[in-house]
Every structure is written in C-alpha cells, then in structure tokens.
Amino acid sequence: MPRAQLPEDSSAVDMDILFPLDSVIGTELCPSPIPQIIHFVLFVVFSLVILIILRLYIPREPSSVPPREEDSENDQAEVGEWLRIGNKYITLKDYRILLKELENLEIYTFLSKKCLKKLSREGSSHHLPRQVRPGPVYKPAPARNHRPRGGRGKASPTSFHVSPRAPLAPLASMPSSVPKTSVESLGSPSSLSSSKPREPLCPLKHPSHQPPASTLSPNPTSSTESLGYLSSLSSSQPPEPLRPLKHPSHKPRGRSLPRRRNPGWVSWSDSMQADSETDTIICPMCKAPERSCPHTWWVPSSPRVIRGVGRCSDPNLGLSWRQEAARAWCHCTSSQFPFKHPNLPTHLPKASF
C-alpha cells in the first residue's frame, strides 16, 4: 500500500511509529486461552474476599442441632452455650427455667407439709371437704306440715313429720282447739270458733284507754270464771292503796261517733276528770282533789293481768280488765261505804250471752 508523500517542511509524525496497529490487531484476533483463565481467577478471588468481609458484619443465627465435639476454636465457642446432662444437650435458657421450677416445687412441698401438720394437731373431727359423713341423713320437714289439719283439733296421722335435727315447736304456740268454759250454753259458740279462723280483736267501746296486747291471755275463758276468781281474791286479800294515774285518758282528735253508754258498767273516761288550771285529778265520788280524797283506791297503781278477760270469740262479750276491777271493788266495798254514786252499780248484774 503506497504511503502518501508529505512535504519536507511539514511537522507531521509518522503514525506507524506511535501506534503499531498491525501488532495490536494481530494479538486480539489470535485464539489463546491464557487471558480468559486469568480473568476468571481474579473474579473468584475478589468475590471470596467480599464474602469474608460481609460475614463479619452479618449476625449468625444459633443452630438447633448441638455442635460436634471438635478441637477447633469455633466448635469450642459453640459448646460453651450448650449444657450436657447425661446424653442430652440443653441450652442455658432452658437450664434457668428448670431451676425456677425446682424452686417453686420446694415452696409447694413446704406449704403442703405445714397444712398436714395443722390437720394432725386439730384432730380427726375435722372432715375434709366433699367427704360423706357416716350415719343416716334426715331431711327437714316443711314448715306447713307442723300445723294440725282438720276440724275440732283432730290432726291426721301424716300431718306431722318429725326430724331429729329440726327443733320441736313449744306446746304454748299451738292454738287450743277447745276453749275452757264452765257454762254449758257456750258449747256451740266454742265449737264454731274452733272450726273457723280466729277473728281480729275489736276495740272496746266503753273504756277510753285500752290495756296493751301483752297483758291479754292467749287461752280464752268465760267472763263468769274471771268474775268469780276476782271476787275470791278481793275477799281473801285486803285492798291495797292505789296510786293516781299520771296521764289522763287519751281522747281521739276530730269528730267522734256518739258512744253507747251502759248504766250497769262504770265508764272509766267519766270517772277520771282533770282540772286544767291545777292539773290535778278529781275523785268521781266526792268531787275532791286526789290528795285530800279518802277514796284513794279508785285509781289503779299498776296494771293487773286478769287471765281470759277482754278476749273472746265474740267481740260483744269482750270485757275490759278495768271494768272488771271496778265492778269487783264496788261489790266488795258496798257495805263499807254508805254513799252511792249513779255510775257505780249496787248489785252484780248477770252476764248476758
């Protein structure tokens, strides 16, 4: 290939001297495997170096398989985290958990021994819970079976179910089926009152101040028995001095219905009169103050209980204990006091039934 001729005065440099193109092209086109092997070796070396560097900074996860016993330093470091018990390997964390469980077990055994000592000291009378005691078991009878059934106080044989644990009711609480009467004419009313339920007590019409319910007797008797008993007491015992009442009779407020007066009985509200100016009690017989009056017996000092008075099956037959006392005193002292009072009877009237 002919080269171009350059002028002499030109400063051009020959390119073949600076860049031998023919030699470079020839080396690239020749098929030799040496440079490829060198390139592969260099790539592998650089990759291994990079992996080693990254391994130091990446955290390693613990393996679940126990390490093998080898003499290398890495294997000895891994064995330090594992504990060998017999033929088994456990980690340090599991070992600490086992220690805590053993401590709790010791505490539980100590508490159980303490409870057993207490039970042995108290004795064998204390039974453990849910333990069946020997002996027959009795069921308590219902409350409705304790009252007798049927009329006239005749109870059926199956009306009472007595259990050994249930306390027996007292006989005083049982209602008496037949009232105690001495008059034969009261036979039919007493039988009717025993078969029918008891009626509530009606308030008395004549006395203004009624005695409390605690002074009444639960066993009903006739009025004739109470009169005979009271007259026998008044004849055998001397009359005691009676004190005046501090509080006058309680009068209801507002309008009240007119009361039916019986001339044969003493009205206690009429016999007690209080002077509003001097606040003294006036005797109904001599119209004198209580201090200067010789009849100091007409005011009761303390309430006396008369069995059977004021409580009867018929409300019209109920008598006040104060009326009974006034009648008895008037009957006994009629011979001692010659004066007469229109409200006090001179003879004992017959009881009307």
From Swiss-Prot:
<feature type="region of interest" description="Disordered">
    <location>
        <begin position="122"/>
        <end position="271"/>
    </location>
</feature>
<feature type="compositionally biased region" description="Low complexity">
    <location>
        <begin position="222"/>
        <end position="237"/>
    </location>
</feature>
<comment type="similarity">
    <text>Belongs to the SPATA31 family.</text>
</comment>
<keyword id="KW-1133">Transmembrane helix</keyword>
<feature type="compositionally biased region" description="Polar residues">
    <location>
        <begin position="211"/>
        <end position="221"/>
    </location>
</feature>
<protein>
    <recommendedName>
        <fullName>Putative protein SPATA31J1</fullName>
    </recommendedName>
</protein>
<keyword id="KW-0472">Membrane</keyword>
<feature type="transmembrane region" description="Helical">
    <location>
        <begin position="34"/>
        <end position="54"/>
    </location>
</feature>
<keyword id="KW-0812">Transmembrane</keyword>
<dbReference type="GO" id="GO:0016020">
    <property type="term" value="C:membrane"/>
</dbReference>
<feature type="compositionally biased region" description="Low complexity">
    <location>
        <begin position="182"/>
        <end position="195"/>
    </location>
</feature>
<feature type="compositionally biased region" description="Basic residues">
    <location>
        <begin position="244"/>
        <end position="262"/>
    </location>
</feature>
